[in-house]
């Protein structure tokens, strides 16, 4: 691993020319796939853990703006804004602890429908490898890259058809997560690149919904481990 890192850094140094660095603005769209997660609910009946809850596939979209450094044009910073909505559909799952139908000995339970909307804003570090340089593409007409960041997530959960929570009474929580990604950008016109990107994001979302019976707060927690496949356009100047 150390040898591979040294080779990559050496390649980046060798490909860094005397030209000044560049600004960039990206827009992208794609699909997100969120892994199964345990959902923890503290209701008036007690603690219940809904095991292996599935999330629907979601449209993902966003934008990114930033700049590569003058002294190291292979290294840049960007502000990324990213949205996806991994809805929880009606399903039967195993529940440990208190079940919505009553009793705290576990058993089968249903989630019914909850809307989940996640908006993330992140300051990303970007490392690119400029390949196939030309006069019209001084930073490379082919650019593999990797990114990493610690996004702030705003997660809104809205019960729609549940018996456990007060429906249409949403709550929003804020929490930090992390993001790792990689992709490749190809020049399609002067100052314009087409790119494809994979990213993985993680956040532990926490909100407080309303108990349908008592109207007291019912904290809900879940992990959103999400794989996103994106395509987009990048303006460079």
For every predicted segment, state its role.
Residues 1-7:
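Bacterial N-terminal signal peptides that target proteins for export
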Residues 32-61, 173-174:
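Surface-exposed strand-loop-strand hairpins of Gram-negative outer-membrane beta-barrel proteins
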Residues 37-45, 89-96, 156-166, 206-214:
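Outer-membrane beta-barrel translocator domains and adjoining extracellular loop/strand segments
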Residues 38-40, 49, 104, 189-237:
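Predominantly the C-terminal beta-signal and adjacent terminal strand-loop region
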Residues 46-53, 106-114, 163-171, 215-221:
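Extracellular loop and loop/strand-boundary signature of outer-membrane beta-barrel proteins
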